[in-house]
Amino acid sequence: MVTIDRRVQPIAHLACNHQRAFIDMNESVHHQGSFFGRRKGHKLRAHQADLVDKLLPHLALAIDGPAPASLVELFDPPVEAVRLEIGFGGGEHLIAEALAHPSTGFIGAEPYVNGMAKILARIEQENIRNIRLFAGDAAALMAWVPAHDLNRIDLIHPDPWPKRRHWKRRFVQDAMVGAMARALRANGEFRFVSDIDSYNAWTLAHLLRAPDFDWTAERADDWRKPWPNYTMTRYGRKAEREGRRAAYLRFRRRAA
C-alpha cells in the first residue's frame, strides 16, 4: 500500500477535498448504462464509410453471446495477453501500443463513428492484426469480458462531463471500478490520463477507496510525467499547447 507523503500530497489532497465535497452523494443513481452520450460527428468521407461498412464487421466484437473462456481466443494470429482501451478517440495511442506489442491483443472501445473510421484507416494502412473494436456500451463490454482476463485497461483523456448533472456519465464510478477489478488479472493495471483536475481528483478518490486497487505512485513525478514509452495523443498535445498539464495515474489490481 502506497503511503501518501508530501511528494504526492498535492493531488491526494485535491482528491480528499473533492471526495468530501462531491462524492458523498448517493451513487445508487449512477446506474450502469452508457457512459458515452455523444456519438454524432462529421460526415464520413467515401473511403471512411467504405471501411466502416466492410472492414469493421470483421474486427467488431459481438457481445450478444457468451464470452470466450479467454479473450486471447478472439485474435488470430495468437496473442499472449489482452488489453482494453476505452474511448480511444483518434486511435493514436491504441495504434502505437498495438504496433509496439504484437504479441498482445488490444480491444478498443469507441462510440464515435469518426474515431472508428480513423482507426480503421490506420489498421488497413499498417496491416495491424492484433486489434478488435467495440462501438457499444462500455459498461456492457466490461460485464461481458471473462473474469480476471485483462492485463490492462487504459482510459486516456476521457470526456470529463464537467456539469454536476452529467457526472453519472463519467466512466469512473464505484460500480465500474468494481467491474474493472473483476475483469483485471492480479497485478493488472488501470491507467488513467486527464488534463482536467476535477476528473483526476474524482478518479483518485474513487480508486483510493476501492479495496482491490493500489495507487502505484511513490513520488510526484510518477503522476506528473507520462510513463515510459507513452504515446501522446493529439488531444494531449493540444492540452499542453494551451498550458494544461495532465496527470498520469496508474492503479494496480491487488492479488486475491
From Swiss-Prot:
InterPro entries: SAM-dependent_MTases_sf (IPR029063), tRNA_(Gua-N-7)_MeTrfase_Trmb (IPR003358), tRNA_methyltr_TrmB_bact (IPR055361). Pathway: tRNA modification; N(7)-methylguanine-tRNA biosynthesis. It catalyses: guanosine(46) in tRNA + S-adenosyl-L-methionine = N(7)-methylguanosine(46) in tRNA + S-adenosyl-L-homocysteine. GO terms for cellular component: tRNA methyltransferase complex. S-adenosyl-L-methionine binds at residues 85, 110, 137, 159. Pfam families: Methyltransf_4. The active site is at 159. Gene3D superfamilies: Vaccinia Virus protein VP39 (3.40.50.150). Substrate binds at residues 163, 195. It comes from the Bacteria. Keywords: Methyltransferase, S-adenosyl-L-methionine, Transferase, tRNA processing. One of its GO terms (molecular function) is tRNA (guanine(46)-N7)-methyltransferase activity. Its EC number is 2.1.1.33. Belongs to the class I-like SAM-binding methyltransferase superfamily. TrmB family. Catalyzes the formation of N(7)-methylguanine at position 46 (m7G46) in tRNA. HAMAP family: tRNA_methyltr_TrmB. This is tRNA (guanine-N(7)-)-methyltransferase. It comes from Rhodopseudomonas palustris (strain HaA2).
